[in-house]
Regions:
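Helix-loop-helix hairpin linking two adjacent transmembrane segments in secondary transporters
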Residues: 120, 124-173
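Helix-breaking motifs and short loop linkers at transmembrane-helix boundaries and internal kinks
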Residues: 22, 54, 75-81, 92, ...
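A late C-terminal transmembrane helix in Major Facilitator Superfamily
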Residues: 332-368
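A membrane-interface helix-boundary motif in multi-pass transporters
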Residues: 140-153, 243, 281-284, 363-380
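Structural signature of the two symmetry-related core transmembrane helices
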Residues: 57-72, 280-298
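Conserved MFS/SLC helix-loop-helix module at the cytosolic interface between two early adjacent transmembrane helices
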Residues: 41-80
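Cytoplasmic helix-loop-helix junction between adjacent transmembrane helices
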Residues: 85-124
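Extracytoplasmic gate region of multi-pass secondary transporters
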Residues: 10-11, 206-265, 323-324, 328, ...
Length: 408
């Protein structure tokens, strides 16, 4: 939830920032894209660090970095400064979700991971839905800068809570029962590390065609997801000319529905795995989700009525986010002990697609208007549904063994 707050705050203030700092639509696309490309570049290294040092330590660093640059966003005084701040922001925030997956892989059995990921993603969407109700009144009463100062303080409070509350391993938690601990350790499907562990080549995993299909699917998903995170508010305000007093609800409705989609997707996928096995249980639910989402976004781009478009986009985002927890659960299933690296790779691929799409959106909107870029986003999301037919969650990625690694 924490790492989504700044994105929605920036999107909510986009019109005001562009007017106040004299930023064009094309330049705004570069600002949004700069965060995304930095995030993509550092996602895999930060996921690897989490595999090596543990998710708790890396998440502490990520959120403290997030808090600092959320506050720094409020100090931006022009295009170049905001561009630099957003690049550094993305560089440090990278790895948040891969390291969350590392934490979940240690604490949850395999067949509960869909629901665990659904809780994480549902909370992020719920936070995104509530953020406009917090930041827009602050922006209207004070200024857009103040909203970023407030959000930065929220991240510091979360970090203090995380330091004292979370334990890296279930065995370190005093409140867990012996029976529950034994159940988690027996069903989480992680290797037991021995003194003389085998050193493996992480990069050898990229020979897996299964992984490449996962990356391709996530690009399609991320193109749609980042439209809502980056351009959606601007699309409503400048593309559909929705009044400022209506923007809070118009911006929040899709995220409220998306939270329902996240919770539903994870729950349905876990249930489907029990009924049809992990291969089809992890495949059918997100495939239907992206199929319906693509149709809804395409429909929203083509209708003239604002209310109909907002409803269609809300339903589309709900079905699209059915995919999110399942995709991350599949990355955990396929990656095993390297789930941080694999989920980081998946997110990096998605972010690369989101970067190109975000920048391209600005150029298309300034040249052709807002309906055409929304249309192409819907088509890409629709294509992602069919890629799920080539993804098999039962096929773990095989990593090449290099040499024994002796722990001293």
């Amino acid at each position: 939830m924490i790492t989504f707050l700044d994105r929605i705050a920036l999107s909510s203030a986009s019109g005001t920032i562009m007017d106040e700092l004299h930023i064009t639509t094309v330049q705004w696309g570069w600002i949004l894209g700069m965060f995304t490309i930095a995030y993509a570049a550092f996602e895999i290294p930060t996921g690897w660090l989490g595999d090596k040092f543990g998710g708790k330590r890396i998440l502490i660093r990520v959120v403290l970095w997030w808090s600092f640059f959320t506050i720094m966003t409020g100090f931006a005084s022009g295009f170049m400064m905001l561009l630099c701040v957003r690049f550094l922001f993305g560089m440090g925030e990278a790895g948040a979700y891969p390291n969350t997956s590392i934490v979940l892989s240690k604490w949850f059995p395999v067949l509960e991971r869909g629901r665990a990921q659904a809780t994480i993603w549902g909370a992020s969407r719920l936070g995104a839905a509530l953020t406009p109700f917090l930041v827009i009144p602050i922006q209207q009463k004070y200024n857009w800068q103040t909203s970023f100062y407030v959000l930065g303080a929220v991240g510091v409070v979360w970090t203090l809570f995380w330091i004292f509350w979370h334990k890296e391993e279930p065995a370190e938690c005093r409140s867990i029962s012996k029976e529950e601990l034994e159940h988690i350790l027996a069903t989480r499907d992680l290797p037991v590390h021995k003194k003389d562990a085998l050193k493996i080549s992480v990069w050898s995993g990229f020979k897996s065609t299964n992984l490449w299909f996962l990356l391709a699917m996530y690009i399609c998903y991320a193109v749609g997801a980042y439209f809502f995170q980056s351009w959606f508010h601007t699309y409503l305000e400048k593309g559909r000319h929705i009044a400022k007093d209506q923007l809070i609800w118009a911006s929040s409705i899709p995220y409220l529905l998306a939270a329902v989609g996240c919770f539903t997707g994870g729950w349905l996928s876990d249930k489907a795995c029990l009924r049809w096995g992990k291969k089809w249980g992890r495949r059918v639910v997100p495939m239907v989700g992206l199929f319906v989402a693509g149709l809804c976004i395409i429909g929203a781009a083509l209708v003239a009525d604002n209310l109909t478009a907002i409803i269609a986009l809300g339903i589309g985002m709900a079905f699209m986010d059915v995919t999110a927890p399942v995709a991350w659960a599949v990355a955990m299933d396929m990656g095993g002990e390297k789930s941080g690296t694999i989920s980081g790779s998946m997110n990096s691929a998605g972010l690369l697609g989101a970067y190109l799409s975000t920048v391209f959106f600005g150029y298309m909107a300034s040249t052709y208007g807002y309906y055409l870029p929304v249309l192409y986003i819907g088509i890409i999301v629709f294509i992602g549904a069919f890629i799920w037919l080539k993804i098999d969650a039962t096929k773990k990625i095989q990593f090449a063994i290099l040499a024994p690694e002796v722990n001293k």
